Amino acid sequence: LAVPSFQIMLANAQIRTATQAMYDGLQLARVEAIRRNDRVVFAKGTGSDWTVTVEGGAVVQTRSSSEGTRQATVAVTPAGATQVTFDSLGRIVANADGSATITQLDVDVPTSLISAADSKEQRVTITTGGAVRTCDPNAAAGTGTAC
């Protein structure tokens, strides 16, 4: 009886950790763009991997999904988008390669790990003004955590 509850707790902890990692990477990219007075790119890799680089230049920081979030899955909106670029004012600008800009990341775990009903999916949203926010897509409207 305790084992399934523990599995649910661990899976949801991975969701929270991966969500926080995505949020932190996006905030890092935004802050570095402002600090460096340059364009900085947040690039999402596979799973919850990401890399922050100065556009056309040096890597600022990289995070691997093996850092505690191996089971987490991240769905990107729009589909196929892989990066977002911040300008020196912390706003979103067009990616240098012309690719679509990430506007939303939905973090979950596979239903083979825990049921969808037990999963506490999280979302990271990015506005054109550069604001990054985490929210719960399943929370009731009007609550502080609702998207």
What spans do the regions from the language model cover?
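N-terminal helix-rich module
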Residues: L1-V31, R35, R39-C147
